[in-house]
Curated annotation (Swiss-Prot):
This is Large ribosomal subunit protein bL9. Binds to the 23S rRNA. The gene is rplI. GO terms for biological process: translation. HAMAP family: Ribosomal_bL9 (MF_00503). It comes from Xanthobacter autotrophicus (strain ATCC BAA-1158 / Py2).
Amino acid sequence: MDVILLERVAKLGQMGEVVKVRDGYARNFLLPNGKALRATKANKTRFDTMKIELEARNLERRKDAEAVAEKLNGQSVAMIRQAGESGQLYGSVSTRDIADGLTAAGFTVDRQQVILNHPIKTLGVHVVPVTLHPEVEVTVKVNVARNADEAERQARGEDVRTARDEDAEIEAELAIERAEVAAELAAEEGTEG
């Protein structure tokens, strides 16, 4: 189906372009969301009359998005999740979770604006792009941790997974030393008696 784009659509085209898309994409997404019109002669003339108004509305939305982008760019959102010793999450952090976290921080972000190729399934600080407007994109840091203390340590730059591994190594070394001391004591008692 040929459609006239009423706004810039990522990976499709700019406002005013006539593009060919699959029927389902047009009927289920572009047309209901007001992002496109069917490419008929009547709609082409209608678009030409609406073009100035659409450009003005697009410019206003872009300015609003840029104002929010200044505050949002580089923000950090902490997500507390349960995870195994290796840092693998029991579950995942999705676009909805990130959008809810940003909304709780005082920003108006919809889950469709958060760009994730796949859900986050590991501990750590992840950089996630957020598209506020087709022409305005910012990045936020998603800090996935087991608890608030761990989130603070990760925010400072510590790798919590290696810190836990180091703690486990120290504990193992202490256990070996204790076993050696116990063996020495047992050997001394055996030679005395």
